[in-house]
Design a protein with these regions (language model features):
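Ribonuclease/tRNase effector modules and their secretory precursors
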Residues: 1-85
Length: 85
């Protein structure tokens, strides 16, 4: 998790983001190769995340709670309009 995530969103800790990543409920890959995901943190909050995976390394460069409508719509579109949370 990049430090800038917590700097921009002090309501999220690194532990919150890692917990949300480990409990992803819905995800989709963008054409760019970046992944979008929504997971549940340890406090029961839905967290939107953007990340890239390179081999065994995952870099989460964006996280926000609660997920925005725009974020959810994009995941729906990428997943073929299956409804997310």
């Amino acid at each position: 998790v990049l430090d800038r995530v917590m700097e921009r969103h002090p309501e999220l800790s690194e532990k919150d983001v890692v917990t949300a990543f480990r409990s992803v409920m819905v995800d989709a890959e963008r054409e760019s190769g970046a992944w979008m995901a929504i997971g549940l943190d340890g406090r029961g909050r839905n967290v939107e995340m953007l990340y890239r995976a390179v081999g065994d390394l995952v870099v989460i460069y964006h996280a926000f709670t609660p997920p925005t409508k725009k974020f959810r719509r994009e995941i729906d579109r990428l997943r073929g309009d299956r409804r997310t949370l």
